[in-house]
Amino acid sequence: MASNSSSCPTPGGGHLNGYPVPPYAFFFPPMLGGLSPPGALTTLQHQLPVSGYSTPSPATIETQSSSSEEIVPSPPSPPPLPRIYKPCFVCQDKSSGYHYGVSACEGCKGFFRRSIQKNMVYTCHRDKNCIINKVTRNRCQYCRLQKCFEVGMSKESVRNDRNKKKKEAPKPECSESYTLTPEVGELIEKVRKAHQETFPALCQLGKYTTNNSSEQRVSLDIDLWDKFSELSTKCIIKTVEFAKQLPGFTTLTIADQITLLKAACLDILILRICTRYTPEQDTMTFSEGLTLNRTQMHKAGFGPLTDLVFAFANQLLPLEMDDAETGLLSAICLICGDRQDLEQPDRVDMLQEPLLEALKVYVRKRRPSRPHMFPKMLMKITDLRSISAKGAERVITLKMEIPGSMPPLIQEMLENSEGLDTLSGQPGGGGRDGGGLAPPPGSCSPSLSPSSNRSSPATHSP
């Protein structure tokens, strides 16, 4: 046993457990630190051979590192260069960044997002090849949207962005309360009064029907058409009166007032008549109490538009809208800054904002347990525009069915920047070559102008 003990190499002999110590002795202290007590580790480090290399202590490394930093300071980071984007790919305006896959300005970004989210359907009234630039981008929404697609804007990016915001947005509190401020309350009452004075409720009308009881959807009934066109003219006049009572509307330029009325008149007429729908009899009641069923409305001139109007009326029933809500929704349809050829679209948007706020507060205060009713109402505006576009197309075929000319006020209402340019030059039409009713820019329309002194006939309100 003694001989075995004496034959073991000692630390001072340059070997450890029979193996030569490598020259890189500083690899071992970390590993040995967990196996040997601190005192033994220090003794062992002093006994290990150096072999040309010294083992720096942690304190030495730290001192060298800190002194090195003091001698050679790191250079300061240069300031980031401002990002310069290419002009907007759609209209060549100044770009605010990359939106939905391309460099775009704020205007085109917002237009594309709204168009996709609301599934907007636009129509080009020229050759579907309009020039889109900073000046002309608001003149043709159809060609502007097509240009967005052509330059690479992505529908999926809009949807993904919307879904991302939905996930990130906190869930609204159902107990959120909405208080009607005096200003909002006054605005609501003004709009309610304007609506009621130009559109009496169904209960105020004495219903009457026609003698035509045929249930076959055949050709146009001329007698029904004559009566319906007469009532429609009165409805248009009442719509103009409604617009003149809306706060701020008459402060707009005359040209913008006419543009808004022509663009939204059919929307408002359809919304109004659909609030007079009676589901039990499947009938609609017009001004003076004229009540028609589906077949009679088809013969009166609605034609293939009939089922669309009745379907929309059925969709309104669950909303249970009162006069204030119908009036506010009509006002929002009318005062809308995205209509074509407006001189001051930003000012129109400013007038629309308090109407939107008033409708939101009123709807949520009236239905505190149904927070989604307000957006549902706003979505009906998109449906109205779609039906109105088809209604304008219906006029083209209707002109070939009626024996005489189209009533002037109805034709003028539909001959607008978003309606029927194709009526120009037709018999009885208001085209450029036919002494049209539409006024030139800056002039006042003799019939649709809100500043006109023309008053409605002394008949029942529509």
Curated annotation (Swiss-Prot):
Listed PROSITE patterns:
NR_LBD, NUCLEAR_REC_DBD_1, NUCLEAR_REC_DBD_2
Query: Bias regions of kind Polar residues — which residues?
Result: 52-64
> SMART domains annotated for this entry?
HOLI, ZnF_C4
Residues of the region (Hinge) are 154-182
Q: Name one GO molecular function term.
A: RNA polymerase II cis-regulatory region sequence-specific DNA binding
What does the PTM comment of the record read?
Phosphorylated on serine and threonine residues. Phosphorylation does not change during cell cycle. Phosphorylation on Ser-77 is crucial for the N-terminal AF1 transcriptional activity. Under stress conditions, MAPK8 enhances phosphorylation on Thr-181, Ser-445 and Ser-461 leading to RARA ubiquitination and degradation. Phosphorylation by AKT1 inhibits the transactivation activity. On retinoic acid stimulation, phosphorylation on Ser-369 by RPS6KA5 promotes interaction with GTF2H3 and the CDK7-mediated phosphorylation of Ser-77. Ubiquitinated by UBR5, leading to its degradation: UBR5 specifically recognizes and binds ligand-bound RARA when it is not associated with coactivators (NCOAs). In presence of NCOAs, the UBR5-degron is not accessible, preventing its ubiquitination and degradation.
**Record InterPro entries:** NHR-like_dom_sf, NR_DBD_RAR, NR_LBD_RAR, Nucl_hrmn_rcpt_lig-bd, Nuclear_hrmn_rcpt, Retinoic_acid_rcpt, Znf_hrmn_rcpt, Znf_NHR/GATA
Domain text: Composed of three domains: a modulating N-terminal domain, a DNA-binding domain and a C-terminal ligand-binding domain. The 9aaTAD motif is a transactivation domain present in a large number of yeast and animal transcription factors.
What name has this protein been given in UniProt? Retinoic acid receptor alpha
Source organism of the structure: Canis lupus familiaris
Taxonomy of the source species: Eukaryota, Metazoa, Chordata, Craniata, Vertebrata
**What is the gene called?**
RARA
